[in-house]
Amino acid sequence: MNTFKELSNLKGRRALVTGATGNLGKVIANTLAELGADLMLVDQPGSDFDSLTAQLTERWGVAITHHFCDLELQIQRTELMAQVNKSSSGLNILVNNAAFVGTSDLTGWNVPFEQQTLATWRRALELNLTAIFDLCQGFTPMLQAAEGASIINIASTYGMFAPVWSLYAGTTMGNPAAYGASKGGLIQFTRWLATTLAPAVRVNCISPGGIWRNQPDEFVTRYAARTPMKRMATEGDMRGAVAYFACDLSNYVTGQNLAVDGGWGVW
């Protein structure tokens, strides 16, 4: 029987993380690097990979490459997959983290329903769902050939539950329809893909609860009061779930959606 240390060791495995320079992406990259995985970091053109790569290399000593890619554009996704497929290092772990979120600066996004635009709805579904379908499909041959292959999709509790609008009263915050729709679709796609790629590739999903990012005090207070753990989440709260699904501790787990929400969904 392998030890827990052996089961959690990702040395010799390679992980691709999208949205790698964002708040959650950096935490995911650090988590996988700490467990020994070599990394391919992906984010949109103009992203600052240099400081993140330097920090990860100095701290964990893993091999790191990075790729600029606007995942909203199919042509750039195709180029990314071609570059990765040409490499000889393989791919063991795919983390689909990049997404438009509730605070994204988009026209017709974080506004009342009557003002949400069809163009922005389409953009959100393209990045939050279609791009993930595309990457999973394109990387399937590499993953099927790899040891301990795992796909981790980052969804949201808003893909599971409707928004509680009273939390937003008196603030300029919103909850776009396309966000919940795309994340709900991602959760179901995770289940579908898990049955399709098993047993060679495990496919699981993490649904964070609300993450604290300097929201208005009244929103934070209301959110915390409704949450059994009495606070909002932090990016660091996702580390355990990422590590679990990435490594062999979860080698008999697939098709699951793990809500890391402080108990939000239990009532």
Where do the protein language model's features map onto the residues?
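Short C-terminal tail/terminal secondary-structure segment
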Residues: 2-7, 163-166, 170, 243, ...
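Conserved glycine-rich Rossmann-like NAD(P)H-binding loop of the short-chain dehydrogenase/reductase
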Residues: 35-51
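Active-site Tyr-X3-Lys motif and surrounding loop/helix of classical short-chain dehydrogenase/reductase
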Residues: 79-86, 105-126, 222
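Conserved NAD(P)H cofactor-binding loop of Rossmann-fold oxidoreductase domains
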Residues: 97-109, 263
